[in-house]
UniProtKB/Swiss-Prot annotation:
It comes from the Eukaryota. GO terms for biological process: protein maturation. The record marks E119 as: Essential for catalytic activity. Its main location: cytoplasm. This is N-alpha-acetyltransferase 40. Keywords: Acyltransferase, Cytoplasm, Nucleus, Transferase. It is an enzyme of class 2 (transferase). It is found in: Cytoplasm; Nucleus. Acetyl-CoA binds at I120, Q121, L122, G128, R129, N130, V131, G132, K133, N159. Its EC number is 2.3.1.257. N-alpha-acetyltransferase that specifically mediates the acetylation of the N-terminal residues of histones H4 and H2A. GO terms for cellular component: cell division site; cytoplasm; cytosol; nucleus. The lineage of its organism: Eukaryota, Fungi, Dikarya, Ascomycota, Taphrinomycotina.
Amino acid sequence: MHFLKQYLFYSPRRMKTQEIKNVTLEDVDFLKNLGVWVEIYHHLEKGLLQQCFNLVKKNMEALYRQSSFGWDDSEKLKEMEMEKLEYICIFEKTSKKLVGFLSFEDTVEAGLTCLYIYEIQLDEHIRGRNVGKWLLKNASILAYRRNLKYIFLTVFSANLNALNFYHHFDFVPHESSPQEKKFRSGKVIHPDYYILYTKSRKDW
């Protein structure tokens, strides 16, 4: 257990210690080879919140501005400060810099108990190394252990890389999701976003 704690840390602000069971030796090797460690928070202190916000702004501002939502710094920060949100944060060991995070809440969506993912954000230099998959896997296992039957998330229709990523892991549009509009001419108008969901599971 001491070896595991070198890579996944807990405090009174973070998740319950029994959830350390989610971490396997395979996880430890994965994190070690990446040169990162993970911390899981129920609440972010101001400095770390700003780091998470900066990563979202860097990765997502352009997509927000292309949509009908637009981008507003203060509104996004307000959303990220919500007490119900929990964060899985990934830090680089050498620089101690935040390089990625996943934020989520336990909730009910369309009458289904679920873990709702708000953000999966990665710094560009850590992409393509299965970190997104690792975060999604552990979110799914966490949902399963909390008896949350489903995982929900919202994704911009213009974010094709994200759509392909989620489809690969069996996410499909929920019936409550905005739908495409198809015209007789063959023209298709995509909504700004889709609501995707899948069942939580303990095995990946």
